[in-house]
Swiss-Prot record:
Record family assignment: Belongs to the universal ribosomal protein uS14 family.
InterPro entries from the UniProt entry: Ribosomal_uS14 (IPR001209), Ribosomal_uS14_bac/plastid (IPR023036)
GO cellular component, one term: small ribosomal subunit
Source organism: Rhodopseudomonas palustris (strain HaA2)
NCBIfam families attached to this UniProt entry: PRK08881.1
PANTHER family: 30S RIBOSOMAL PROTEIN S14, SMALL RIBOSOMAL SUBUNIT PROTEIN US14M
Organism placement in taxonomy: Bacteria, Pseudomonadati, Pseudomonadota, Alphaproteobacteria, Hyphomicrobiales
Protein name, per record: Small ribosomal subunit protein uS14
Basic residues: compositionally biased ranges: 11-23
Organism domain of life: Bacteria
Gene Ontology BP terms: translation
Segments forming a coiled coil: none
């Protein structure tokens, strides 16, 4: 089980990213627009740099929904390999069978 502080920190980052996404998108569009004057694009770059780091989507860590584990998490179902194995052995994951050959 991951530390509760790590899980909460990641949840705060998700919330902050969701709130700041439209503003970040606008600033990035201004920066990428080659038709605008260089001063305006540079000002947008400075505004983007002033935004909180945690409002960037790259700061979010994929974590297991059950255990909070950060490594070996499958994006499809948001579960770690350990959680999938436990649920599969209990028969809670449809179609998952123990392999034998």
């Amino acid at each position: 089980m991951a530390k509760k502080s790590s899980i909460e920190k990641n949840n705060r980052r998700k919330k902050m990213t969701k709130n700041a996404a439209p503003k970040r998108a606008r600033l990035k569009a201004i920066i990428a627009d080659k038709d605008l004057p260089m001063e305006e694009r540079f000002a947008a770059t400075l505004k983007l740099a002033e935004m909180p780091r945690n409002s960037s989507a790259t700061r979010i860590r994929n974590r297991c929904e059950i255990t909070g584990r950060a490594r070996s998490v499958y994006r499809l179902n948001k579960l770690s390999r350990i959680a999938i194995r436990d649920l599969g052995s209990k028969g809670l994951v449809p179609g998952l069978v123990k392999s034998s050959w």
